[in-house]
UniProtKB/Swiss-Prot annotation:
It catalyses: (S)-malate + NAD(+) = oxaloacetate + NADH + H(+). InterPro entries: L-lactate/malate_DH, Lactate/malate_DH_C, Lactate/malate_DH_N, Lactate_DH/Glyco_Ohase_4_C, Malate_DH_AS, Malate_DH_NAD-dep_euk, Malate_DH_type2, NAD(P)-bd_dom_sf. GO terms for cellular component: cytoplasm. NAD(+) binds at Q16, I17, D43, G90, Q113, N132. It is found in: Cytoplasm. Its EC number is 1.1.1.37. It holds the Pfam family Ldh_1_C. Keywords: Cytoplasm, NAD, Oxidoreductase, Tricarboxylic acid cycle. Homodimer. One of its GO terms (molecular function) is L-malate dehydrogenase (NAD+) activity. Belongs to the LDH/MDH superfamily. MDH type 2 family. GO terms for biological process: malate metabolic process; tricarboxylic acid cycle. This is Malate dehydrogenase, cytoplasmic.
Length: 332
């Protein structure tokens, strides 16, 4: 039996992240090596020519899994029948701008794209918001796409999760594939809390706690956390452009694990709609440790939370509650 192609929407597809992401999707990195895809690429009218150039390159690459490409500036056409939507398009924060300066623009973008997904997307469409402020953009999308189940609307904190794994693997000179179960709690912003308490590394003599192996609490509670929190800014400083390759790769990881499942005994970080687990405020999109099976994510329950973690989890939660209020004030 031939496998039916899945339709994958990428918004902001002519941009940096989009350009890194679409070949990964077309190669099967996101949905697996046996899953054909039809790419739907959306961008704004000033980017229409560049978008067409990306479409030409996708045709030229002759990807066996790529069964079609829709490149458009029309949001209704872009959303028609999509099974997965990766929302990369948004109004970027420029130098000297605060989060609150871009909020009104992003609220209006996500309100209109939510309405289009609500009307045209496939019934069980899975949505991943990448554009910043990602958690709050996802919350606005949830508000204006009421028929998409809330569990299907997520935001990207896998990039932060992967950054944390990378820092630990470098510090311990270990393979990154041997490091697991770090947690990103909260907002995809510099208030996020990268938590290594449950994190382990596979060694020659079994799995060991990262805290024990690193044996340097000052680094783990200090520089490690700030490096992960501020990694995006460090990349902008080095490249003069924001992280695109790593963002695209982690977006593929997020969707792949969500659709195909997480390995036994391993969890990942995803921004999901809070149900109040771990005394996190309900009604915001917050990053939790989750396991995935059969296309569904589930928050990992019962992890011990010490006092330091509690404070950091509360602080990032408070920032999200504040962002939510700011976003809602833009709607009136």
């Amino acid at each position: 039996m031939a496998v039916e192609p899945l339709r994958v929407l990428v918004t902001g597809a002519a941009g940096q992240i989009g350009y890194a992401l679409v070949p990964m999707i077309a190669r099967g990195v996101m949905l697996g090596a046996n899953q054909p895809v039809i790419l739907h690429m959306l961008d704004i009218p000033p980017a229409a020519e560049a978008l067409n150039g990306v479409k030409m390159e996708l045709v030229d690459a002759a990807f066996p899994l790529l069964k079609g490409v829709v490149a458009t500036t029309d949001v209704a056409e872009a959303c028609k029948g999509v099974n997965v939507a990766v929302m990369v398009g948004g109004f970027p924060r420029k130098e000297g701008m605060e989060r609150k300066d871009v909020m009104p623009k992003n609220v209006s973008i996500y309100k209109s794209q939510a309405s289009a997904l609500e009307q045209y997307a496939a019934p069980n469409c899975k949505v991943l918001v990448v554009a910043n402020p990602a958690n709050t953009n996802a919350l606005i999308l949830k508000e204006f796409a009421p028929s998409i189940p809330e569990k299907n609307i997520t935001c990207l904190t896998r990039l932060d999760h992967n950054r944390a794994l990378g820092q630990i693997s470098e510090r311990l000179n270990a393979q990154v594939s041997d490091v697991k179960n770090v947690i990103i709690w909260g907002n995809h912003s510099s208030s996020q809390y990268p938590d290594v308490n449950p994190c382990t590394v596979k060694t020659g003599s079994g799995e060991k706690a990262v805290r024990e192996l690193v044996a340097d609490d000052a680094w783990l509670n200090g520089e490690f956390i700030t490096t992960v929190q501020q990694r995006g800014a460090a990349i902008i400083k080095a490249r003069k452009l924001s992280s695109a390759l790593s963002a695209a790769s982690s977006a593929c990881d997020h969707i792949r694990d969500w659709v195909l499942g997480t390995p036994e005994g391993t969890w990942v970080s995803m921004g999901v709609y809070s149900d109040g687990s771990y005394n996190v405020p309900a009604g915001i999109i917050y990053s939790f440790p989750v396991t995935c099976k059969d296309g569904e994510w589930k928050i990992v329950q019962g992890l011990p939370i010490d006092e330091v973690s509690r404070q950091k989890m509360d602080a990032t939660g408070a920032e999200l509650v504040e962002e939510k209020a700011l976003a809602y004030s833009c709607l009136t």
